[in-house]
Design a protein with these regions (language model features):
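A nucleotide- and high-energy phosphate-metabolite-utilizing enzyme signature
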Residues: 1-189
Length: 189
């Protein structure tokens, strides 16, 4: 009961953001069920839309200040990257009380199905996720990899060449960036 009371009355927005991905995996089934109920009730709570928008924007700004991109291809931390995508998803989940899936790709698809995200959002997020994995293998410094590695990355991602990869990445970041840039007014409506 103390956890439920804390979540209802005292928890900060960032704590509720973390709950959007929570999934009890250990313990007695009764206890896991009770925890799942508390999480679901917490996530479904009505929220002050202006406060949510303010908190989300401040958190992302603080993160950008304290953890800047490490290179030209840091698709996780660059504007329009995976962190922006995650903030968009979680902000919409908390504001509208729906699409709660611990897996971000499934959450994005659910938000698309409800009309809260555009069709291109999930493919953009998926491309950046696949690129992030590939770059960690061939360019861990998040800089442009050597030409032989560029060809490997392009092929693995289903593109003819590196230029196509970069064009698709720019388009994906544009989609995510547009959603992030428009998040505050959408949360307040």
């Amino acid at each position: 009961e103390s956890f439920a009371k804390y979540q209802r009355e005292e928890a900060w927005t960032w704590e509720h953001l973390a709950l959007t991905r929570a999934r009890p995996v250990y313990g007695a089934s009764l206890a896991r069920g009770q925890l799942e109920t508390i999480i679901a009730e917490t996530l479904a709570m009505p929220r002050d839309a202006a406060k949510l928008a303010e908190d989300i924007i401040k958190m992302r700004g603080d993160m950008a200040t304290h953890k800047p991109p490490t290179g030209a291809l840091d698709v996780k931390l660059l504007p329009g990257g995976l962190v922006d995508a995650e903030f968009v998803i979680h902000a919409l989940q908390l504001r509208f009380g729906q699409a709660f899936h611990p897996q971000l790709d499934r959450a994005a698809e659910a938000l698309i199905a409800t009309g809260l995200l555009p069709e291109g959002f999930a493919p953009a997020q998926a491309l950046l996720t696949r690129l992030l994995v590939m770059l960690r293998l061939v360019a861990p410094d998040c800089e442009v990899p050597p030409e032989p590695a560029q060809a490997v990355v392009a092929k693995a991602l289903g593109f003819a060449d590196w230029a196509e990869v970069m064009q698709a990445v720019d388009a994906a970041r544009g989609i995510i960036s547009a959603e992030w840039q428009g998040i505050a007014p959408r949360l307040k409506n």
